[in-house]
Amino acid sequence: MMKRDKKEEIAQQIAEKFQKSQGFYFTEFQGLDVQKMGQLRLEFRKAGIEYKVVKNTLIKKALRDAAGADKLAEGLKNTTAVAFSYDDPIAPAKIIKKFSKDNEALKFKMASVDGTVFGADALPQLSEMLSKTDNIARTAGLINNMIASVPMVMNAVMRDLVSVIDQVGKLEK
């Protein structure tokens, strides 16, 4: 059994992870064998996501000062592992959805993404969202297209103006 001061220390470390992360996801893994759990951890590690098995009581202590703590605490039943994402808050949703298709033992409980709490039914929507990198790339592409189209529009205006002047000149003759 863990001593109280050790539990407080672990709860403090978990609280720091919650604060640093842009998104965190609670999963249930009961029934997932060691090999599958290793594969899941590897997938998370490749994406720069930290995946930890944590006791529910320690998670509750770590969340006591967090926004939405009551709502998050409701989902803490059975075994819980937490995926902490520090860069891309949507990446864990994509991994969880993909991995749980072949491994029904992995269940999504809930998540907090940029301070918004999502329930167990939100995984499909979360996994379909674009990452920040994708959004930035899409926005940059739109801006680039707008910049590229400005000279074409200006040329069209000038061409039309020349055409109108030419037509007026022909009418006066």
From Swiss-Prot:
Transmembrane segments: none
UniProt entry keywords in alphabetical sequence: Ribonucleoprotein, Ribosomal protein, RNA-binding, rRNA-binding
GO cellular component: large ribosomal subunit
UniProt keyword rRNA-binding, yes or no: yes
Biological process annotations from GO: translation
CDD domains documented for this protein: Ribosomal_L10
GO molecular function: large ribosomal subunit rRNA binding; structural constituent of ribosome
Chain's role: Forms part of the ribosomal stalk, playing a central role in the interaction of the ribosome with GTP-bound translation factors.
UniProt record similarity statement: Belongs to the universal ribosomal protein uL10 family.
Family annotation (PANTHER family): 39S RIBOSOMAL PROTEIN L10, MITOCHONDRIAL (PTHR11560)
Subunit and partners: Part of the ribosomal stalk of the 50S ribosomal subunit. The N-terminus interacts with L11 and the large rRNA to form the base of the stalk. The C-terminus forms an elongated spine to which L12 dimers bind in a sequential fashion forming a multimeric L10(L12)X complex.
Name of the protein described by the UniProt record: Large ribosomal subunit protein uL10
Organism listed in the record: Chlorobaculum parvum (strain DSM 263 / NCIMB 8327) (Chlorobium vibrioforme subsp. thiosulfatophilum)
Gene that encodes the chain: rplJ
